[in-house]
Amino acid sequence: MALGNEINITNKLKRQEIFADIKHEKNKERHTMRRKRAKEERENPELREQRLKENVTQTIENTRVYDETINKEVEGDEDDLMRYFNSNSNEPPKIFLTTNVNAKKSAYEFANILIEILPNVTFVKRKFGYKLKEISDICIKRNFTDIVIINEDKKKVTGLTFIHLPEGPTFYFKLSSFVEVKKIVGHGRPTSHIPELILNNFQTRLGQTVGRLFQSILPQNPDIEGRQVITLHNQRDYIFFRRHRYVFKDNERVGLQELGPQFTLKLKRLQRGIKEETEWEHKPEMDKEKKKFYL
């Protein structure tokens, strides 16, 4: 039964009956087609393989539009952070951790979490009268490699600022979806072992720079016997932080125990040097193109 002038039928019951018949006929045709296709594929398995190969669901990820400013010829070029890895220095990173001015309790609680996650951290409460440039100069003289600033607003941690010393760059991330350790069901207790680092899906030149940032604040010699791993998974320019421990159940099976916490980072700004020239900044109009990602 074809769909013609049935929509103009004024009798509601009659109209519903006709639409039900049309729907039933379409379902009948679909089931007949599926039975016929299944019979053909049983006789020739190659037809099924070809159908599954061609039947690829379109997602935002596989229809991604790459940033036209990324040139493949320069995608592997060095950035400011690459010099850190080329310096052949075996010294572990030394991190100076602080907060914004007049921070509240939530910022200090999050600082305790970062002290547990990042090795070789020195935390200092932020005082009035010290500008960021002055703090950076003091940290450089004391051989700190990075500054991490916890940004808090209205008693809530809203972002993280990373400054690589001595010449930058500076990263500002918005922080969201924070879940405390105690709210994670079945969480474990972390140990003092240096964790492994897994970076996933950082594909563009900007994404590689962000990945090198996280590589530079964690030592390159993890304690394998600790079985702890930090995962930073980039999906649609949102960076998901997770921390787990491998749990060996027997000689063949292995599981994961989450250690926590959970939070999400989104890059908002990348600046050269110590908060100098803006190299990249996220703008609201960038969110209009849902298939275009920058990391």
From Swiss-Prot:
One of its GO terms (molecular function) is rRNA primary transcript binding. Residues 24-47 are annotated as: Disordered. It is found in: Nucleus, Nucleolus. GO terms for biological process: maturation of 5.8S rRNA; maturation of 5.8S rRNA from tricistronic rRNA transcript (SSU-rRNA, 5.8S rRNA, LSU-rRNA); maturation of LSU-rRNA; maturation of LSU-rRNA from tricistronic rRNA transcript (SSU-rRNA, 5.8S rRNA, LSU-rRNA); ribosomal large subunit export from nucleus. SUPFAM superfamilies: Class II aaRS ABD-related (SSF52954). Its main location: nucleus. GO terms for cellular component: nucleolus; preribosome, large subunit precursor. It holds the Pfam family Brix. Essential protein. Required for biogenesis of the 60S ribosomal subunit. Part of a complex that includes BRX1, RPF1, RPF2 and SSF1 or SSF2. This is Ribosome production factor 1. It comes from Saccharomyces cerevisiae (strain ATCC 204508 / S288c). The lineage of its organism: Eukaryota, Fungi, Dikarya, Ascomycota, Saccharomycotina.
